[in-house]
Structures are given as structure tokens and as C-alpha cells.
């Protein structure tokens, strides 16, 4: 309270490694992009330089690399008196691009994420548990911009031509892509009007 400069101030400190943040009317979300390293299982012949000496080594290429990009989410509640209280933590697969990759709607956190599998929207409940997500869109493309507006999300990915995806979020447990529009060039910023 700036009108009472001699009043004691109570502070809470939290030490986190963050790459982005989002503040809604009632919550503060802090995000940390990370990478979980999985198991790498190279073919035996490449380990020892042997070609066929121990016979063919069969492996499932889907299991070869199990590393993945993740986004860790820390949620803090903004209390009535203006103080902040830690609420919960969670994580989702994929990474975000900027502050427009997040949105809180009806108490649910919505995130636009991408990785090598594609782009997607993931919806988390107030305890940061996943309640819905889209299928991976634009496999092999990078997400360049995203924007949430009410029950819709808009994503722009890029490879050669910029597809603009429209995603219906009216049912948070079953978000779905409504369609895409291919436009030349690429957009790194979407602005509602």
C-alpha cells in the first residue's frame, strides 16, 4: 500500500528457471522449456564396428530415440488480499513459442505447443492435469504464431506455405481442428480485431 510507506511488507520468494510467463485475473503461470532425455539404443554393430559378425540386430526405430521436449508449468494463485500462493505444478509434451501460446478460459489453461511430431493445443484443468488435446497438426513444420480468442484458437505453421489452422475449443475435452487456410509467406504474429 503506497499510502502507508512505513507499514511492513511481507514477501514470498520462489526460485524457478522460467522461459515464459502468463498472468490471468486469478492466477500466475510460469513456464520452463526442458528436454527429457530418453534411452538411446544404437544397433550393436555400430557399437563395436562389427558388420554382421553377430548377425542382424533388429530394433524398433520408434524406440530408438525416446527423448522429447517438454514444458513444465508452475501455477500460483493470486489471493483476495493480493498475496500469491503456490498452487500446483505439471508438465506437457512440446514447447511454446511466446506469450501468446497460453490462455486461461473458464479456469482451464490452454497451451499451443509444438515439437517434431507437429503442433497441438493442450487443455489442462485447474490442477494442471490434461483434459483434452488436438491431434498433431502440421507434422514436420514449425509453429510460428498462435492466438486464442474465446472458443477458438488460431495457429500458423511454416514449411513452404503458411497454413493457418482454426481449432474449435468449445468442448475442452475434445478440441478439434476445423480447417486450414494455406497462404504464401509466413506470419509470426496474429492480432485479433
List each language-model region with its residue ranges.
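Beta-sheet-rich non-transmembrane sensory/scaffold domains
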Residues: 1-193
